[in-house]
């Protein structure tokens, strides 16, 4: 993939799969996964982008889309994923939408 193609990659919400996806020519090349919790929170627990797509800011684009959508729905963000935590640390505009991680959040995250 060259830098020009990065603009052609789309981001979509796969509600059934409980994830936001980076899509290149119909193929999922990255995702950030979440679990709904308590009716008003989303626990983001894992983000991945294929290695060949790395270094182009795509993970940041993906996470920004997911967090913006979550906030627009009036839900709070629970950051278990290290990438999402790091992103939030650099973007204080999300601060009011972030809920602190509690033990019950960790227990709700899928294993494996």
Predicted regions and their residues:
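Terminal substrate-recognition subdomain of acyl/acetyltransferases
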Residues: 1-31, 41, 68-72, 76-78, ...
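Residue-level recognition of conserved beta-strand positions in structured domain cores
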Residues: 24, 46-47
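Basic, gly/Ser/Thr/Pro-rich low-complexity segments located predominantly at protein N termini
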Residues: 31, 35, 60-62, 86
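A conserved beta-turn-beta hairpin within the catalytic core of GNAT-like acetyltransferases
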Residues: 36-44
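A short, internal acetyl-CoA/4′-phosphopantetheine-binding micro-motif in the GNAT/acyltransferase core
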Residues: 47-54
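Conserved acetyl-CoA-binding loop-helix of GNAT-fold acetyltransferases
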Residues: 55-66
């Amino acid at each position: 993939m060259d830098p020009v193609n990065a603009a052609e990659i789309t981001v979509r919400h796969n509600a059934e799969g409980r994830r936001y996806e980076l899509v290149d020519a119909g193929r999922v090349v990255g995702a950030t996964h979440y679990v709904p919790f308590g009716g008003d929170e989303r626990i983001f627990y894992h983000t991945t982008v294929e290695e060949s797509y790395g270094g182009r800011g795509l993970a940041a684009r993906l996470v920004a889309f997911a967090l913006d959508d979550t906030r627009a729905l009036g839900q709070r963000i629970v950051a278990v994923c290290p990438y999402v935590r790091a992103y939030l640390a650099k973007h204080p505009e999300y601060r009011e939408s972030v809920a602190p991680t509690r033990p019950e959040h960790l227990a709700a995250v899928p294993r494996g």
